[in-house]
Every structure is written in C-alpha cells, then in structure tokens.
Amino acid sequence: KDAFDDCEDHYTDKMIQELIASQKKYEREDMPTMLILLDDILSRDFKKTNDITYLCSKFRHYEMSIFLTTQSFRSVGTIIRNNATNILIFRQNNSKELDKIKEEYSELCGSEALFMDYYNLAHDSPHSFLYIDGQENPARFYRRHEVLLGIGDKKISTETPRDKPKPFKIAKDFTPEK
C-alpha cells in the first residue's frame, strides 16, 4: 500500500463510481489511462451485478484497463468473462476449476482436446501460464507472452505436450492425521 497513492484493501461500488466520474471530466482524447487491479475480490459478499460488471462492459470508453485475479473461475460474472480480452491461465490444481475454464475457452480453438494441448504446452515450467489474446480473431494462444502456440484451431507449435502431472485430487477415503 505504501508504494501506491490510490490503493485500497476493500471494494465498494462508490469507488468505481468516483473513478468513472473523474474520467468523465475529460474529453476522450485527453483522458488519462488508468489501470484497476482487483486481486481476488470475489467473495460471497461480492454481487454478480455491481459497478465492476458495468465497468467491464464499458471500460474502453473510460480509458481503463482492468486486471482481475480469482481462484474461483465461475464466481466471476458472465458479463465480465465475456468481455475479457486478455486471459492468463496459471496451472490449476483443482480439476473441476480446469474443467470450467476448458469449457469456457475451448470454443476459441475449436476443441477441448486442442485447448488442453495449448494448456499443457504453456505450463512447461513452474509459474508459467497460458495467455489467450482474445482481441485477435481468431484468438491467439501463447506460452507466457513469448511463444505463439496456436491461432484458433491452427496449432503453430511443433512441440508435443509432455506428460504433465494431473490436477491434485483428494482420495475419497483420505483422512487427515490429527
């Protein structure tokens, strides 16, 4: 918080309303560019219909970029997910979360199997991620921002995914030690 002038540790709709009002004071060409970072703000108290949802559908008009992180993919509302233009997918340890992500974004490359190829190719090292550039049509799939893996259903990379560890699952008969 000390490194940034306008950093908050909570969210209210009023904050977004004030940001929009401050941008509306400018002509479009004079608006300052703004980045809003929302780090895991999605909780049971975060309504799916709020000013963030509105802003995510209109952010281009206000010269704002929005970076939203979450650990629960579907807790992000449909309007926000549908308006996402750049998606970063880190390694998922929860197979159900990965299934939701795969279901949502596999249509950008034509099949769930190809999506999983892109996903596995992107996670070649710790802390790596699959980057989807959804502003392009067809979408472009990258390892980090460095290696183009494919354009839509056209795989560019000649690599084959290595055997990757399966997402972590707790055995049904698991009992934690006390």
Annotate the PLM regions.
Residues D124-K178:
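Conserved P-loop NTPase motor module
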Residues D2-S111:
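Conserved P-loop NTPase motor cores
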